[in-house]
Amino acid sequence: MANAVGKITQVIGAVVDVQFNDHLPEILNALETENDGKRLVLEVAQHLGEGTVRTIAMDSSEGLVRGQEVTDTDGPITVPVGPGTLGRILNVVGEPVDEGGPVDAEERRGIHQDAPEFADQSTEAEVLVTGIKVVDLLAPYSKGGKIGLFGGAGVGKTVLIMELINNIAKVHSGVSVFAGVGERTREGNDLYHEMIESGVIVPDNLPESKIALVYGQMNEPPGARMRIALSGLTLAEQFRDATGADVLFFIDNIFRFTQAGSEVSALLGRIPSAVGYQPTLATDMGTMQERITSTKRGSITSIQAVYVPADDLTDPAPATTFAHLDATTVLSRAISELGIYPAVDPLDSSSRLMDPTIVGDEHYQVARDVQGILQRYKSLQDIIAILGMDELSEEDKLTVARARKIQRFLSQPFDVAKVFTGSDGIQVQLEDTISSFKAVVAGEYDHLPEGAFYMVGGIDEVIAKAEKMAADAA
């Protein structure tokens, strides 16, 4: 049967109504039309009755006119998948946007897939070492798990994601997929060129590249921003299922997925729920997050940046995301104001792996001791602010001194932030991190100045920096 053809009856921004006289397209079907000489994809969102469907445009709808013909593709939006996508940048409908010619892919997949059956999912717990001290020590990431990076505007989510790509994608033998959801075009461009510089993308021999990129940037219509995460996820699922690989799936930023869903929901005339979000917020998030999982064939480890509106973690968007995560890394403005980067909050960040049966007794105990000292310091800060340090007991003075050293020791220079710090990035082995913090907690380095602990790797560098500071002072 020939694909059904309909006519546009109404255009309101990103929402386009199309009337079909015979065969009505199903919900989530992709429709195609010509706009300004380019293919425009519309996704069916509602059946309005009398042969009319309401659709969401995946690109700008400027230039569309009533009466224009639209063809039903008889299936969902599809994207190219497989090795041909490596080193390429695709948009939401799988078209290349890197001016590198057509994508050499043998297979296309629909972006709406069912999550794997429960019986097929893997439940093993294994630590994914990142080389970032504060993460590995206090809120370790799980291989095949979901990790959230929470933070307000400008506290370093994208820098942390780029460092994780740098640290893990380089040493990681599998492939990675990066979904840029509603973020800055400049950051997307910077990321692409950084990938080329670091050898993760090989422009002269694309099959050797280790990452595929899908972008739906801030300036794109809400339909594209809402579906781009699913396009990226479809690529990641194919790598996992076809090759049995361990896939890294980066999303920057998952909040924009929710935000775009909220815009689309309002355009479709749904009654908003709390704080103006769409009534289907939990369903939209759950449908996507359930697909990001590890099966017995391979794993998808997902690292998601989550923008926190007005630094309010109780906002429905970040709160809904929390429920799906194995580990949360919370970035704090108060810590970034102290100049400590990565600005990870050691007391707010958590991980399901922080269990002695998984990480071992020594790691668990050191992490709890570090958090205990930092928590005591936090509770003493009001007293210090009002009465000053002199009013504290000797024991509390020692706790404060150690806490300030620990706080600075949790900072670390990043490869991707070399432009800002002027020093090369350092990755620290997990064993070194544990032994270093164990010694600091035990008071073995109480004699060293706290400045020596700032922006260094292991404890050997602290000692070297302290000696240099002493020599400079003399």
Swiss-Prot record:
- Do the record's keywords include Transport? yes
Q: What is its EC number?
A: 7.1.2.2
Pfam families associated with the record: ATP-synt_ab, ATP-synt_ab_N, ATP-synt_VA_C
Q: How does it sit in the membrane?
A: Peripheral membrane protein
Sorted alphabetically, which keywords does the UniProt record give? ATP synthesis, ATP-binding, Cell inner membrane, Cell membrane, CF(1), Hydrogen ion transport, Ion transport, Membrane, Nucleotide-binding, Translocase, Transport
Residues annotated for ATP binding in this entry: 151-158
SMART domains membership: AAA (SM00382)
One term under GO cellular component: plasma membrane
Q: Name one GO molecular function term.
A: ATP binding
Output the superkingdom of the source species. Answer: Bacteria
Q: Which reaction does it catalyse?
A: ATP + H2O + 4 H(+)(in) = ADP + phosphate + 5 H(+)(out)
Q: Give a yes or no for keyword Nucleotide-binding in this entry.
A: yes
InterPro entries, A to Z = AAA+_ATPase, ATP-synt_VA_C, ATP_synth_F1_bsu, ATPase_a/bsu_AS, ATPase_alpha/beta_chains, ATPase_F1/V1/A1_a/bsu_N, ATPase_F1/V1/A1_a/bsu_N_sf, ATPase_F1/V1/A1_a/bsu_nucl-bd
List locations, semicolon-separated. Answer: Cell inner membrane
Output the NCBIfam families linked to this UniProt entry. Answer: atpD
Describe the subunit structure.
Answer: F-type ATPases have 2 components, CF(1) - the catalytic core - and CF(0) - the membrane proton channel. CF(1) has five subunits: alpha(3), beta(3), gamma(1), delta(1), epsilon(1). CF(0) has four main subunits: a(1), b(1), b'(1) and c(9-12).
Question: What function is annotated for this protein?
Answer: Produces ATP from ADP in the presence of a proton gradient across the membrane. The catalytic sites are hosted primarily by the beta subunits.
Q: Which family does it belong to?
A: Belongs to the ATPase alpha/beta chains family.
Protein name, per record = ATP synthase subunit beta
Organism of origin is Jannaschia sp. (strain CCS1)
From the UniProt record, report the name of the gene that encodes this protein: atpD
